[in-house]
């Protein structure tokens, strides 16, 4: 009886294992028990798309015809279109290009060599003429020697006389002559120190006179107030006159 019960249990376990075996799995097949992933045929005829979410969502074509797109429409502006005529700028172009310039170009660029006021095709100095007809040189281009390169280096010392006028800046006339200039170290230059020493006594006397005049004005105002106070005290209309009158109140100015 026990043997029959054991056989029944063994057959049940074998059936359960057989249900989950790779042979019965729909993915089984081929080497290693794994079948290759086969894309499903799309019978609707539409393109397959995949939507990618995230920071930059986008739609990716994943079907077999993802590279086939609609051709772009014909544009109005092409490389053969005359943009001046298309935007109606021919009149403005002729107006500004035919205007005579008051000052020549050489007045703005005096150090530029060659004749730059006229058009370049007259003396074959335009860029097109140089490209079409390059200059014929008898020698090859050689690197500069150390002596020649010394002319491009900065040397210590003062600037030569012929170049000083290029860097000279016209001096400005100060409108406020009495304005006091502040210096970084608090010391005036030598040219102004001599002038200050010469006029030191005069400025001291002027300052003393101004201070004395201010004190005299202050003393005069004080005497005038005292005189006015005494006059009000002895007047009959003043309420403080008499023996039983109240003491005069001092006024604070």
Curated annotation (Swiss-Prot):
**Per its UniProt record, what InterPro entries does this chain match?**
Mediator_Med19_met (IPR019403)
Q: Please state where this protein is localized.
A: Nucleus
Write out the GO biological process terms. positive regulation of transcription by RNA polymerase II
Key words, A-Z: Activator, Nucleus, Transcription, Transcription regulation
Output a single Gene Ontology CC term carried by this record.
Answer: mediator complex
Q: Short name of one Pfam family for this protein? A: Med19
Q: Which Gene Ontology terms cover its molecular function?
A: transcription coregulator activity
First-listed, main subcellular location of the protein, grouped into a coarse class: nucleus
Composition bias (Low complexity) maps to 21-40
Give positions of region: Disordered.
Answer: 18-49, 157-253
Query: Does Chloroplast show up as a keyword for this record?
Result: no
Instruction: Describe its partners and assembly state.
Output: Component of the Mediator complex.
Task performed by this protein: Component of the Mediator complex, a coactivator involved in the regulated transcription of nearly all RNA polymerase II-dependent genes. Mediator functions as a bridge to convey information from gene-specific regulatory proteins to the basal RNA polymerase II transcription machinery. Mediator is recruited to promoters by direct interactions with regulatory proteins and serves as a scaffold for the assembly of a functional preinitiation complex with RNA polymerase II and the general transcription factors.
Record-stated family:
Belongs to the Mediator complex subunit 19 family.
Quote the protein name from its UniProt record: Mediator of RNA polymerase II transcription subunit 19
Protein source organism = Aedes aegypti
